């Protein structure tokens, strides 16, 4: 089943195995995300546009790993890079970034920081992979640790909404106000 613009997957989630818990949480959140009806109608989007995401290891079929990754990167409209000090050192994350950018879809690369600091110049805390810096002059990202609220859960939710708004090319407030209201109602 194809999703948007002829792609099999809305997005490919690139992460290091040490960040699997954060990547799984992101994967679950995005696949279950439902857009406000007003936004669906106004922008002509699907109510659940991110239902189909490529997430390894659950979506990997036994073959040669590099070929499987290339095939699924080609089949994905977006690349989400889960950024952390461990992913910044990962050869596979670097490969996925390089290959996706070689497809001519650099504008569809999105970053979410789950650990570490951007542009820290310290390899123990740097969260951006060197290949990101090679392809992009300015790196914009959602950061689950950015403190807007006292509760870490709300900061994480805000970062997810930032990521979703960027991928769908909609205004952050168009999604955030509605999502925040739903969280308060619960």
Language-model regions, residue ranges each:
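C-terminal interaction surface of TIR/SEFIR-family domains
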Residues: 1-31, 52, 58-76, 85-94, ...
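Short mixed-charge
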Residues: 32-54
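Inter-motif core of Ras-like GTPase G domains
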Residues: 79-81
């Amino acid at each position: 089943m194809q999703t948007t613009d002829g792609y099999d997957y809305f997005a490919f989630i690139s992460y290091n195995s040490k960040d699997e818990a954060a990547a799984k949480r992101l994967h679950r959140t995005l696949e279950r995300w439902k857009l406000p009806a007003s936004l669906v109608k106004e922008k002509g989007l699907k109510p659940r546009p991110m239902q189909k995401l490529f997430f390894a290891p659950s979506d990997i079929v036994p073959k040669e790993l590099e070929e499987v990754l290339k095939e699924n990167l080609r089949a994905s409209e977006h690349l989400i890079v889960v950024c952390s000090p461990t992913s910044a050192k990962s050869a596979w994350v670097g490969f996925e970034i390089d290959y996706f950018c070689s497809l001519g879809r650099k504008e569809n690369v999105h970053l979410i920081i789950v650990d570490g600091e951007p542009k820290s110049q310290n390899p123990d805390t740097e969260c951006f992979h060197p290949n990101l810096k090679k392809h992009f002059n300015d790196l914009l990202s959602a950061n689950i640790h950015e403190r807007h609220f006292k509760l870490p859960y709300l900061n994480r939710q805000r970062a997810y909404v930032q990521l979703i708004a960027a991928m769908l090319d909609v205004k952050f407030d168009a999604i955030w106000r509605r999502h925040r209201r739903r969280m308060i109602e619960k």
